[in-house]
Amino acid sequence: MEKSMIKLKSTVIVVLFALLYLLPLNGRWLWSPDETRYAEISREMLQRGDWIVPHLLDIRYFEKPVAGYWLNNMSQWLLGHTNFSVRFASVFSTALSALLVFWLAMMLWKNQRTALLAATIYLTSLLVYGIGTYSVLDPMVTLWMTAALFSHAMILRAKLTRERLLAWGLMGLACGMGFMTKGFLALALPVISVLPVALAQKRIKELLLFGPLAIVVAVLLSAPWALAVHAREADYWHYFFWIEHIQRFAEDDAQHKAPFWYYLPFLIVGTFPWLALLPGALRSGWTERKVNPERFFLLCWMVMPLLFFSIAKGKLLTYILPCFAPLALLMAAWISGLAPVVRERLLRINSWLNIVFGGVLGLAVAALGLGIIVPHFYQPGEGLTIISGIVCFIGWIAFAAVSLRKQQTWGYLVAGCPLFLALLVGGSIPASVVDSKNPQTFIRSHQPLLEDSRYVLSDEVGLAAGLAWELKRSDITLFKARGELNYGLDYADAADRFVDEGAFPAWLADKRRSGNVALVLKTDRDSDDEYRNLPAPNQLRKSHRYVLLFYKQVVP
């Protein structure tokens, strides 16, 4: 009976994963700038056959190392030129992270129910789902940090020297791949997570003795590419270390500056539909650190990265994704160890929290649809879009309500709360957002004009990347704003890839002699102020914030 229940639960989790992570993947437009950027970088890598030096729009792009791009490359190579292939590497990495969570739970507690629950909590947590189906590098670096977490557990349980050597070698492998995916950050997180555990368990000597092995393995793994990119681009490491690491995280002009408490609300919302488990799980990691040292180990891997990112001046929501694997394990272990009566009470509280959460968000969508919160957020004729958005959260409430019926057996049905959101969110986004963040619709609507243009320009890098991806051409010229390609545009061979607004009339007069010109703009607001003073186009197409100015060739 027990085995059949475990098999049934495993099947349900696999089906839920397919419905959440795979089925909707191709049905949502790519978001700008992140998804269009990563889609185009890998498309160009495949087209150029250059897997060493990253380029975007055929311009040097040194913001990240290459391992994440390699995974995206393989996805596009295997699955073709689709939105599914753009996002698949993120989904694949998230699935592997969930498997590592399951295996680690089995290693720590040898209980399949707890292990399945940990994997389920991880996969259905709102933040993990949101980032895990979005084409960024964070799910990939999270995979390697989860592998480092797994390796650390092996280190703590190793008895023989050869077991320690293997575990520390695997730690080095995970750190090396993390470094190859997102840089020095992937080396810092394991160090700050391992250190307090070593201090608490008086294993500093072991850390000093075997830790260098992990460093050697990480260096050996990353050295071939690191040397190859240095040979090709001597300034790569200077830019990548000082600009991308020091300035981004530490200096006063760091990118994405935010206060210390920035991540707290995202942590709270990101743990839905399991929020009620959060306080007790974190508390148990500290109060039971002597009775259950594995919980303190997990707490360190969750809290130390969170503190690190909170102290850093530059902050982005996606940075805290690596915190959720140890958090899911802590939650599963804590609730599994509660007395049945206490567990049922906690699950009931959790269900009601989800009912309130779904109700508030459903009402928020309705209020947006009526123009109460933000006027004109939804446009006339978008009734079905509004209904779709409301149904997303009616589904959330429905799963939470059903889970109230029999808490002992049905309490974990809250795992299905995100299902309607996952399936319907693509059809719930208003046109005002689509026409400012999802350039594919606008590009496809005007594809004949764009394909008939010898020169295509854009005033935003994310939009330019979207044009390059859709048109399968990397020679998009930047207009007026250099954005994140500012560094690459300083190279002599990229001098003709940027046109200043003041020089545009003369540039246009010259280029129109040899072909049509298309200028695609993303305006700050729904007005003509930003293009009123430009040369008059032959055709002007506009949809909310996206504008296309088409200049027909002038035959000399």
From Swiss-Prot:
This protein's pathway: Lipopolysaccharide metabolism; 4-amino-4-deoxy-beta-L-arabinose-lipid A biosynthesis
Database matches in Pfam families: PMT (PF02366)
Cellular-component GO terms for this entry: plasma membrane
Compartments, as annotated in UniProt: Cell inner membrane
Alphabetically ordered keywords of this record: Cell inner membrane, Cell membrane, Glycosyltransferase, Lipid A biosynthesis, Lipid biosynthesis, Lipid metabolism, Lipopolysaccharide biosynthesis, Membrane, Transferase, Transmembrane, Transmembrane helix
Membrane topology: Multi-pass membrane protein
Domain of life (superkingdom): Bacteria
EC number of the protein: 2.4.2.43
Catalytic activities: 4-amino-4-deoxy-alpha-L-arabinopyranosyl di-trans,octa-cis-undecaprenyl phosphate + lipid IVA = lipid IIA + di-trans,octa-cis-undecaprenyl phosphate
Group of enzyme by EC: transferase
Swiss-Prot/TrEMBL GO biological process terms: lipid A biosynthetic process; lipopolysaccharide biosynthetic process; protein O-linked glycosylation; response to iron(III) ion
A GO MF term: 4-amino-4-deoxy-L-arabinose transferase activity
InterPro entries: ArnT_tfrase, Glyco_trans_39/83, LipidA_mod_glycosyltrf_83
Membrane-crossing residue ranges in chain numbering: 88-108, 116-136, 179-199, 207-227, 258-278, 296-316, 319-339, 355-375, 384-404, 410-430
Function: Catalyzes the transfer of the L-Ara4N moiety of the glycolipid undecaprenyl phosphate-alpha-L-Ara4N to lipid A. The modified arabinose is attached to lipid A and is required for resistance to polymyxin and cationic antimicrobial peptides.
Family: Belongs to the glycosyltransferase 83 family.
Name of this chain's protein: Undecaprenyl phosphate-alpha-4-amino-4-deoxy-L-arabinose arabinosyl transferase
The organism of origin for this protein: Pectobacterium atrosepticum (strain SCRI 1043 / ATCC BAA-672)
